[in-house]
Each structure stands twice: as C-alpha cells, then as structure tokens.
C-alpha cells in the first residue's frame, strides 16, 4: 500500500507521514530531505545551487545514511533546497529512488510536494495537507526556537509565502493537489487531531478498495 502526502512548506505533512507510517508499520520517506541533502552537498562543495550538471551528479550519488543529519532541518538548507528542487534534471534524477522506496512491501508513506501527481500517481491513498500560512509560520518558528535557532516569525512567514510561490510556479512538478486527493486542512488541528483525520481517510479508502 502506498500513501502519498503532499502539501506546502511547514504544513505538517512530515510529522503526519511519520505518525502514519508508525501506525501502519510502513516505511516512511520525507522526500524533502532528499532535496535538502542535495542542497547541503552543493553548499559543502561551494557550488552554485543552480549548477545543473553538478546538482544532478550530487543527486545520483546521494547517501541515504546522511538523511538523518539535523543540519538538514535548518532554515538555510531549506531555502537552498527550494532552489535545487526547481531544477527539472535534479527531480528526474531522484524519481527512481523515490519510486523504488514506495514499491517495497508491505507499504510506504511518502510525503513531499509531487508524490500524488508525479512520483506515485497511482498511490492507494492521496492526502493533500493545507494550513493557513500564518499558522504554518508560527509552527515553523516554534520548531526553530526549539532547536536553539533565532527565528523572527514575520520573516519566517515571508519566507513561507515566497517558497509557496516558487513551488507552485516552477516548471518541474509544481505543487498542486491531485484530482483524486483528499484535502486535509489542519489549521485548527493539533498533531493528534490531524493523525486521526488522516487515518479516517485511509480507512475509508481501504474499505472501498
């Protein structure tokens, strides 16, 4: 079973993906981490983030063991990843990695921005997570401060709005809700509420298969 979760930055899709994977005993892949890993490798090399050839080479040589590096969660890496992920050739280079992950039994939960539309268009369940930008900025600010980072909520909001615009309008796999996706607005839901709502969606889908 493949569960695809998409949504904009800081919408809560990553946390939801982890919880759903644990609930069902499936593997979980935060596909945003893949692009963050490419971005970090590019920065470590001192390379131009828009250097397509270098970025593709880095993408093809990714080491999954490094996906847990806490540095990947920082705002700076997130901003860099937004640039790298807009390169069509980079996205193409990473498609097979994601599809192979999704195909491994007994099931997988993948979260990102193009899972239900590009990576796994035939996913058994598709959930598109949304939340008010101000709510997302507040959550992201609290996360950053929890890691000991200085974070200005107004600047975080501005960055989120900028990333939304970039993600929606990029030429390669723009952020959009699949026609057969279930929209989950968690603006007024805590983590537990969001998980319960998602499980209800999944169980309903399983019952009608």
From Swiss-Prot:
GO biological process per UniProt: pyrimidine nucleotide metabolic process
UniProt cross-references to Pfam families, sorted A to Z: Cytidylate_kin (PF02224)
Catalytic activity: CMP + ATP = CDP + ADP; dCMP + ATP = dCDP + ADP
Keyword annotations of the record: ATP-binding, Cytoplasm, Kinase, Nucleotide-binding, Transferase
Origin superkingdom: Bacteria
Keyword field contains Acetylation: no
GO MF: ATP binding; CMP kinase activity; dCMP kinase activity
Cited InterPro entries: Cytidylate_kin, Cytidylate_kinase_dom, P-loop_NTPase
EC number from the UniProt entry: 2.7.4.25
Residues noted as binding ATP in the record, renumbered to the chain: 7-15
Cellular component, GO annotation: cytoplasm
Localization, UniProt: Cytoplasm
Family: Belongs to the cytidylate kinase family. Type 1 subfamily.
Matching NCBIfam families: cmk
The name this protein goes by in its record: Cytidylate kinase
Organism: Afipia carboxidovorans (strain ATCC 49405 / DSM 1227 / KCTC 32145 / OM5)
């Amino acid at each position: 079973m493949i569960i695809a979760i998409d949504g904009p930055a800081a919408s809560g899709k990553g946390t939801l993906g982890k919880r759903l994977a644990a609930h069902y005993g499936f593997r979980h892949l935060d596909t945003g981490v893949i692009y963050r890993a490419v971005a970090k490798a590019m920065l470590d090399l001192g390379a131009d983030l828009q250097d397509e050839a270098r970025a593709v080479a880095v993408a093809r040589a990714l080491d999954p063991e490094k996906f847990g590096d806490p540095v990947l969660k920082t705002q700076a890496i997130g901003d860099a990843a937004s640039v790298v992920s807009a390169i069509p050739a980079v996205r193409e280079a990473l498609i097979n990695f994601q599809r192979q992950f999704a195909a491994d039994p007994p099931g997988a939960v993948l979260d990102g921005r193009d899972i239900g539309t590009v990576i796994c268009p035939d996913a058994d369940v598709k959930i598109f997570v949304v939340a008010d930008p101000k709510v997302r900025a507040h959550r992201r600010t609290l996360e950053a401060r929890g890691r000991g980072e200085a974070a200005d909520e107004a600047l975080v909001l501005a960055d989120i709005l900028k990333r939304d615009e970039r993600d929606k309008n990029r030429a390669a796999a723009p952020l959009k809700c699949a026609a057969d996706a279930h929209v989950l607005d968690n603006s007024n839901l805590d983590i537990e509420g969001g998980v319960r709502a998602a499980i209800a969606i999944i169980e309903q889908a399983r019952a009608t298969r």
